[in-house]
């Protein structure tokens, strides 16, 4: 079994202990002051509203047969989840009933991988894989201290890898559980997906109230004023977010499930955040930007993390309804990359496209552009979808990120990324 780095539990400092004890802020208790609340019972969640149609670009644009599409997706899943552990797989079982997704290149486990892996498992009906990933994630949650309820992870900033509580993975995991509830509900003795989703959504929504304020620099997941998700739940991230962690489609589903109007407001704020962050000519998005859309120095280029924003833009259009800006954005981005050469464009650029910052032709970007092409209207969209079809998951050290992006793009382009 591959080795992996595990984030140590946060130490409980005296001040945090005293504050948490005085407020009685366990995840099953009423919170602080007049903002107190009780976790919702998963049974009270409303059903999600699925769109009536999921376009299948592989079939309807490329003319691929259903059998060929099914075989391609099965091959990708089997390679990533059950392939050769030394060169193909990123999913590994541990203990009797758990599993994790390994970032092979960095030799660590990230909540982004766990969350995307759970989404893939729900969409493909792989309940055993889903349950194993969730049990691993739940076992790794901070059990006490200011970060109680968050998941430990690792993040990159430039070439630096650091421990973090990454909102990207937290949001993916919560949404995967919500979709699992819609697909399978909960049989006696099995995981109560609705209850687990409710607990995570309450953590996301009310973490700061649970802590009776900001404790040891730990904040809530969302800024209550702008209604944007923080880059990290820390005061160090005040006024900063990432386009890749804005997920308005998810927030609209959370509104449907909980009835909380905050989530629709967060969805609108996220869409506007994309608009003000994207370059008006190329459509390229920075890694980080202030809440007002100004790129953050040192994170002001379009590189690998930014690719994930494209999937979120597409899902918002597919799941929630027509988003005219999303179509325009897709056209801008694909026109830019078509001008760079569909088979040769680089993996990183300055936002205006004038400077290459990563010359590698990245499979993960081919996948993201292929997904964008689903909602684009320019003629070149066909070439981007075809390029995505011809991708096979990478083998070797870099297979984690590209493999997950390819799997997501295949589900989106085959009409199999659905709401349950």
Q: PLM features: what roles do these ranges have?
A:
Residues 115-127, 137:
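Alpha-helical support elements that line or immediately flank enzyme active sites
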Residues 19-41:
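Bacterial Sec-dependent N-terminal signal peptides
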Residues 36-88, 104-111, 146-152, 162-168, ...:
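Extended ligand-binding clefts on enzyme/binding-domain cores
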Residues 132-139, 172-179, 185, 191-209:
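Active-site-adjacent structural elements in enzyme catalytic domains
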Residues 2-13:
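Bacterial N-terminal signal peptides that target proteins for export
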């Amino acid at each position: 079994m591959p080795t992996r780095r595990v984030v140590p539990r946060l130490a409980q400092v005296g001040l945090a202990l005293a504050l948490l004890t005085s407020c009685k802020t366990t995840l099953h208790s009423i919170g602080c002051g007049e903002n107190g609340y009780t976790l919702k019972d998963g049974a009270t969640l409303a059903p999600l509203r699925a769109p009536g149609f999921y376009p299948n670009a592989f079939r309807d644009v490329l003319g691929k047969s259903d059998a060929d599409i099914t075989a391609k997706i099965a091959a990708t899943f089997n390679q990533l989840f059950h392939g050769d552990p030394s060169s193909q797989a990123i999913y590994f079982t541990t203990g009797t009933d758990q599993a994790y997704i390994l970032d092979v290149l960095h030799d660590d486990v990230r909540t982004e991988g766990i969350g995307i892996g759970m989404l893939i498992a729900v969409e493909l009906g792989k309940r055993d894989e889903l349950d194993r990933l969730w049990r691993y994630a739940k076992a790794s949650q901070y059990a006490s201290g200011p970060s109680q309820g968050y998941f430990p992870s690792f993040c990159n900033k430039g070439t630096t890898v650091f421990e973090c509580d990454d909102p990207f993975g937290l949001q993916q995991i919560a949404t995967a559980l919500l979709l699992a509830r819609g697909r399978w509900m909960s049989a006696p003795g099995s995981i109560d997906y609705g209850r687990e989703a409710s607990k995570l959504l309450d953590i996301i929504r009310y973490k700061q109230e649970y802590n009776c304020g900001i404790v040891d620099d730990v904040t809530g997941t969302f800024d209550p004023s702008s209604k944007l998700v923080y880059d990290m739940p820390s005061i160090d991230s005040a006024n900063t977010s990432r386009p890749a962690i804005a997920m308005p489609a998810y927030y609209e589903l959370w509104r449907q499930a909980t009835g909380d109007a905050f989530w629709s407001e967060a969805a609108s704020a996220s869409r506007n955040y994309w608009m003000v962050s994207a370059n008006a000519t190329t459509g390229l998005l920075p890694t980080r930007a202030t809440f007002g859309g100004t790129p953050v120095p040192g994170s002001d280029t379009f590189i690998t993390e930014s690719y994930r924003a494209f999937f979120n833009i597409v899902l918002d259009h597919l799941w929630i309804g027509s988003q005219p800006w999303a179509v325009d954005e897709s056209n801008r981005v694909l026109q830019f990359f078509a001008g760079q050469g569909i088979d040769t464009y680089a993996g990183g650029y300055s936002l205006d496209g004038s400077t290459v910052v990563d010359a590698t032709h990245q499979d993960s970007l081919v996948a993201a552009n292929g997904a964008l092409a689903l909602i684009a209207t320019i003629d070149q969209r066909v070439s981007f979808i075809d390029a995505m079809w011809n991708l096979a998951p990478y083998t070797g050290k870099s297979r984690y990120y590209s493999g997950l992006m390819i799997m997501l793009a295949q589900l989106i382009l085959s009409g199999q990324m659905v709401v349950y």
